[in-house]
């Protein structure tokens, strides 16, 4: 993060800088072309013309992790594939974010067995989880919007915010 | 071509090798000795009248609690006659081994490797019997009945704290 | 068949290189590469740009579906079948349902049969559209990808109308369909049929006589019929070599013998012929969907699950009236139906090739063994045979034309 961190807390100057930097990051986040299984097809559907992802600046799917900043883990991660996922994540330069798309990436999905890693957050740190099997393209876009909001809240110090836990049930039953 | 014709042709040549004949829901399946299995497959493929040139499916089944414990099932199809016949051969622990159909039908290559990988059945005469679906250093054969499913306890609100404390989450 | 058929493994290519062979280079086309066919790893042995040998390394998507199905009842295991060949989930559902129905020996009502044929053919069209889009994308014809997905969205809307889910519908259950067809199903399908043949003409306009496309695909990746049968190559890949074998005509299921359609057959067995065969298959599928729609309209409303109450549950309102229905419902929900001891194998023509399902039952509510004969897994064996002597760019086109789906390869 360089100069912004060294400039310290200069009040209004750093706040505006934060906003500008985060705005720049959200509006042209390049995803890594990383489709594993069925969710990849819905990701392709989200990229296609009906649920266009290029209006969010994500038209270019970079094949090389060195040129990408968002890894959408779309699909089930098997035990053979887990080291590959980790290696690709390590090869991505900072700043980088990870969206776990689909139930298999979030928690292992319907495959609770020897072959599938129960949630890709055992392999890479995840920022946003998108539920669904597979999630509709609109759900993926909702996840991407949530990630954009999370990025907009990022501070210059570079410290990652702690995950927002929902402790109370979402529906209050009286 | 129907079940009776092919059964008669096989009985003529391999009567000693046929251990069982079963016709269930219109499908003919024969259980052979290992020697008969290979010879019958070759005969069915090469005989000009029968022409079962297409090996459609080859897989293994683990009948835990039965002797022989494992069984390899091969479905041969004749495209000309539009008919299918099933050859079965049993093999037992400790080292289940069955003749390989790969020299006769190259399509059996991956299917036998998969059966070896998941069930541990060895195939004599296979050019390269190695693991295919699981990582090379995996120990065990998952599809065997005595291999556990490997499932994780499902997290509900009452036990999630305990489960998540032990799960190897990655933080950076 | 001039040279002997070999299916190399990655170790067979890597070990001599490690031991010191320097005439050829070993290159890894890793599990992550910019081709949307999934996590397939290829180990290439190259002499400059020319491929001397290629060995697929699969297993990066192994999900243990067959083992997991053994721990679920028959009906619950249907959802796992969707996720194998994820471009044609309804085909997987159909294959598994047919295999278990063969074990159970149940009658499926006419309305369900026609709906199964209709939706399976729509699924075939949508799968071929993804194939076309990704194949063209691999060869840098990007507009076709966007056009194909436009039609696919229409088909996915139909699936959503019928089952609630766009892709993993699990709509074909053992005994019939999950729910009855909604009232606006036939008009929606007819709306789709109104546009479809002209859209296929659009794709053909872009590609079939395009000199760039012809340059990349004609004469590339040739395989002859005898090698194809020996290697177990099925589907459009086999029909492109001249063998007119389609399970829908050879061993018909679900009433396919009553529909009139043709089997497109190629001549040379190269990538261009596979392309032509699949485009023609899309047209034939449209024809079948038209016939099925007319039949549905004529048949009118009716039951969509078998009347055998030991297999399919009774309608909910009967439970309050009849003790027998209540008991059937209870047994089905707590235990599940129990097929007789035995085994059954059924194969269908999925968009990838011959998809087979081998089910073994031991008389309990859970299957003893389920095995899927996955066409993509077996088709991959022919890659080395077809790619020898071609260049790496041809290999990309070759994989796309084989149309593998890694979910099915690894199960």
Curated annotation (Swiss-Prot), chain A:
One of its GO terms (biological process) is aerobic respiration. NDH-1 shuttles electrons from NADH, via FMN and iron-sulfur (Fe-S) centers, to quinones in the respiratory chain. The immediate electron acceptor for the enzyme in this species is believed to be ubiquinone. Couples the redox reaction to proton translocation (for every two electrons transferred, four hydrogen ions are translocated across the cytoplasmic membrane), and thus conserves the redox energy in a proton gradient. It catalyses: a quinone + NADH + 5 H(+)(in) = a quinol + NAD(+) + 4 H(+)(out). Belongs to the complex I 20 kDa subunit family. One of its GO terms (molecular function) is quinone binding. The keyword NAD applies. This is NADH-quinone oxidoreductase subunit B 2. Keywords: 4Fe-4S, Cell membrane, Iron, Iron-sulfur, Membrane, Metal-binding, NAD, Quinone, Translocase, Transport, Ubiquinone. GO terms for cellular component: plasma membrane; respiratory chain complex I. Its main location: membrane. It is a peripheral membrane protein. Binds 1 [4Fe-4S] cluster. Pfam families: Oxidored_q6. It is found in: Cell membrane.
Curated annotation (Swiss-Prot), chain C:
It is a peripheral membrane protein. It holds the Pfam family Complex1_49kDa. This is NADH-quinone oxidoreductase subunit D 2. It is found in: Cell membrane. Keywords: Cell membrane, Membrane, NAD, Quinone, Translocase, Transport, Ubiquinone. NDH-1 is composed of 14 different subunits. Subunits NuoB, C, D, E, F, and G constitute the peripheral sector of the complex. It catalyses: a quinone + NADH + 5 H(+)(in) = a quinol + NAD(+) + 4 H(+)(out). GO terms for molecular function: NAD binding; NADH:ubiquinone reductase (non-electrogenic) activity; quinone binding. It comes from Chloroflexus aurantiacus (strain ATCC 29366 / DSM 635 / J-10-fl). It is an enzyme of class 7 (translocase). NDH-1 shuttles electrons from NADH, via FMN and iron-sulfur (Fe-S) centers, to quinones in the respiratory chain. The immediate electron acceptor for the enzyme in this species is believed to be ubiquinone. Couples the redox reaction to proton translocation (for every two electrons transferred, four hydrogen ions are translocated across the cytoplasmic membrane), and thus conserves the redox energy in a proton gradient.
């Amino acid at each position: 993060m360089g100069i912004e961190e060294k400039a310290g807390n200069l009040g209004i100057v750093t706040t505006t800088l934060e906003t500008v930097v985060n705005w720049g990051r959200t509006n042209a986040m390049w995803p890594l072309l990383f489709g594993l299984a069925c969710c990849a097809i819905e990701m392709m559907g989200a990229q296609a013309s009906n649920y266009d992802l290029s209006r969010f600046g994500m038209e270019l799917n970079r094949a090389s992790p060195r040129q990408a900043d968002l890894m959408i883990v779309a699909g089930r991660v098997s035990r053979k594939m887990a080291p590959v996922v980790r290696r690709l994540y390590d090869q991505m330069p900072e700043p980088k974010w990870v969206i776990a798309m689909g139930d298999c990436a979030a928690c292992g999905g319907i495959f609770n067995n020897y072959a599938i890693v129960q949630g890709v957050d055992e392999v890479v740190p995840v920022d946003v989880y998108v539920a669904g099997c597979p999630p509709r393209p609109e759900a993926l876009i909702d996840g991407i919007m949530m990630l954009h909001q999370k990025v907009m809240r990022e501070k210059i110090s570079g410290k990652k915010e702690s995950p927002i836990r929902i402790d109370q049930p979402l529906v209050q039953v009286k | 071509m129907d079940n009776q014709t092919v059964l008669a042709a096989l009985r003529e040549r391999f009567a000693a090798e046929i251990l069982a004949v079963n016709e269930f829901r219109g499908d003919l399946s024969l259980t052979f000795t290992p020697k008969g299995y290979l010879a019958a497959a070759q005969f069915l493929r090469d005989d000009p009248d029968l022409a079962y040139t297409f090996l459609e499916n080859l897989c293994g089944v683990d009948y835990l609690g039965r002797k022989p414990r494992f069984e390899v099932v091969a479905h041969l199809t004749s495209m000309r006659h539009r008919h299918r016949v099933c050859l079965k051969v049993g093999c037992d622990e400790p080292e289940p081994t069955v003749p390989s159909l790969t020299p006769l039908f190259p399509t059996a290559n991956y299917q036998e490797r998969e059966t070896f990988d998941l069930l541990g059945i060895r195939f004599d005469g296979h050019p390269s019997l190695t693991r295919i679906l699981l990582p090379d250093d995996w120990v065990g054969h998952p599809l065997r009945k005595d291999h556990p499913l490997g499932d994780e306890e499902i997290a509900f609100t009452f036990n999630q704290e305990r489960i998540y404390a032990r799960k190897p989450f990655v933080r950076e | 068949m001039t040279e002997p058929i070999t299916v190399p493994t990655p170790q067979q290519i890597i070990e001599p290189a490690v031991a010191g062979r320097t005439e050829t280079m070993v290159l890894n086309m890793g599990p992550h590469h910019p081709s949307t066919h999934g996590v397939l790893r290829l180990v290439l042995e190259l002499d400059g740009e020319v491929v001397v040998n290629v060995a697929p390394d699969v297993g990066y998507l192994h999900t243990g579906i067959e083992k997991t199905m053994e721990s679920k009842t028959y009906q619950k295991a249907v959802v796992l079948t969707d996720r194998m060949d994820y471009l044609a989930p309804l085909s997987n559902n159909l294959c598994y349902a047919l295999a278990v129905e063969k074990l159970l020996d149940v009658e499926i009502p006419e309305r369900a049969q026609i709906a199964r044929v209709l939706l399976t053919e729509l699924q075939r069209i949508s799968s071929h559209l993804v194939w076309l889009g990704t194949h063209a994308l691999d060869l840098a014809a990007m507009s076709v990808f966007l056009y194909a997905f436009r039609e696919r969205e229409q088909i996915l809307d139909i699936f959503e109308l019928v089952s609630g889910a766009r892709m993993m519908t699990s709509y074909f259950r053992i005994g019939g369909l999950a729910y009855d067809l909604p009232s606006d199903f036939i008009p929606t399908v007819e709306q789709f049929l109104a546009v479809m043949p002209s859209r296929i003409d659009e794709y053909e306009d872009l590609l079939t006589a395009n000199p760039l496309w012809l340059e990349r695909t004609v004469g590339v990746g040739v395989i002859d019929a005898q090698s194809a049968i020996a290697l177990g190559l099925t589907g459009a890949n086999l029909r492109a070599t001249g063998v007119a074998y389609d399970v829908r005509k050879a061993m018909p299921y679900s009433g396919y013998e009553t529909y009139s359609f043709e089997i497109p057959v190629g001549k040379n067995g190269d990538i261009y012929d596979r392309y032509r065969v699949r485009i023609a298959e899309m047209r034939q599928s449209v024809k079948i969907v038209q016939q099925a729609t007319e039949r549905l309209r004529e048949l009118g409303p009716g039951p969509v699950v078998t009347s055998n109450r030991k297999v399919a549950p009774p309608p909910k309102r009967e439970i309050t009236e009849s003790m027998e229905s209540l008991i059937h419902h209870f047994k089905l929900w707590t235990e599940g139906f129990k097929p007789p001891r035995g085994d059954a194998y059924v194969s269908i023509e999925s968009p990838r090739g011959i998809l087979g399902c081998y089910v073994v039952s031991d008389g309990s509510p859970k299957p003893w063994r389920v095995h899927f004969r996955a066409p993509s897994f077996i088709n991959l064996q022919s890659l080395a045979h077809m790619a020898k002597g071609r260049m790496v760019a041809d290999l990309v086109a070759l994989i796309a034309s084989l149309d593998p789906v890694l979910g099915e390869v690894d199960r």
